[in-house]
């Protein structure tokens, strides 16, 4: 779906354009209103926001590359991170992620480093109210799509409730 994203420049505005298109696609797949909160989409899909997923994949790629047995690959990554920094796309992206997720640049070279730091940070930022709203939203979507049944409510009523939750 986003093959090669590990090599993207995370500072580029095109990444945000891609993420916006991805969220629009999620809204279309779930048949949700255009003004559905972005924070609900990743919870509804049981994942993390698309931008964070791209960062997670990048960090995993760089971490594995930095610890590779292949010395030319290891050298290029270490040079980009330790000396190139902002002049290197790899260095720029790691600094961006380090600032965003609160880790030290040198942590990448630690064998125990995990790109799941991104997932953990996203889960920390989540709140109980959003989870409850998304659980209700999921049940309403299933009811609207005739997976569940709910007596006493018309499709129009269910769609109104979905619209209200999505934009509240």
Outline where the language-model segments fall.
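Conserved, non-catalytic sequence blocks in retroelement Pol enzymes and Pol-derived host proteins
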Residues: 8-18
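Extended C-terminal regions of large enzymes
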Residues: 21-22, 31-167
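Core structural elements
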Residues: 1-2
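General structural signal for alpha-helix termini and helix-helix connectors
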Residues: 5-9, 31
């Amino acid at each position: 779906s986003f093959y090669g994203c590990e090599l993207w420049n995370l500072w580029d505005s095109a990444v945000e354009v891609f993420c916006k298109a991805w969220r629009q696609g999620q809204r279309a797949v779930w048949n949700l209103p255009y003004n559905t909160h972005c924070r609900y989409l990743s919870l509804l899909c049981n994942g993390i926001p698309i931008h964070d997923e791209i960062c997670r994949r990048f960090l995993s790629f760089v971490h594995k590359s930095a610890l590779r047995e292949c010395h030319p690959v290891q050298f290029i990554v270490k040079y980009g991170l330790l000396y190139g920094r902002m002049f290197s796309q790899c260095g720029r992206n790691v600094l961006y992620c380090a600032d965003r997720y609160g880790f030290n640049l040198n942590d990448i070279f630690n064998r125990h480093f995990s790109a799941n730091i991104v997932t953990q940070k996203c889960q920390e930022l989540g709140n109980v109210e959003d989870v409850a709203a998304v659980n209700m939203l999921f049940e309403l979507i299933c009811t609207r799509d005739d997976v569940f049944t709910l007596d006493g409510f018309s499709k129009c009523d269910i769609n109104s409730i979905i619209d209200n939750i999505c934009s509240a």
